[in-house]
Amino acid sequence: VALPRSGLDITDPVAVDDVIGRLRPRAVINCAAWTAVDKAETEPRACRAANEHAVAALARACRGVDALLVQVSSDYVFGADATRKLPYREDDSPGPLGEYGASKLAGEAAARTWERHQVVRTCGLYSAGAAGP
């Protein structure tokens, strides 16, 4: 079941528990995120609400129904290295430079609180439109 933005406010932990508990999915793939990188510096609370605290709520809800949580993260967890010629590896040390990258790294940590999790680090996602799937 692909939920559009209007189907679940991931920053509302009660709604997250309700929807996950009702649907009882085998897996949850969280593609939702605060992606306004520059705005994250001036609105860190809103950024953290979506990229960290919402992931913690998803992890708790997934634990409640024994669902796999797949958390989509970002290459921003690594920061910037203008001299780097190779892609990052999963065991490279993160070092975010800004609030957006730090919030995505914190979201990864939140996902790891549930043993049945996977983290996918990517540099971008797209869909058919801004309204969701």
What is each stretch, according to the model?
Residues I10-E52, A61-R63:
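NAD(P)H-binding glycine-rich loop region in Rossmannoid oxidoreductase-like domains
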Residues L3, V28-A32, L69-D75, D81, ...:
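SDR active-site strand-loop-helix element
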Residues A128-P133:
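Hydrophobic, aromatic-enriched interface-forming segments
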Residues T35, S74, S103:
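Ser/Thr-glycine-rich phosphate-binding loops at phosphate-binding pockets of nucleotides
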Residues T42, A49, H53-A57, V77-V120, ...:
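Catalytic helix-loop patch of NAD(P)-dependent Rossmann-fold dehydrogenases
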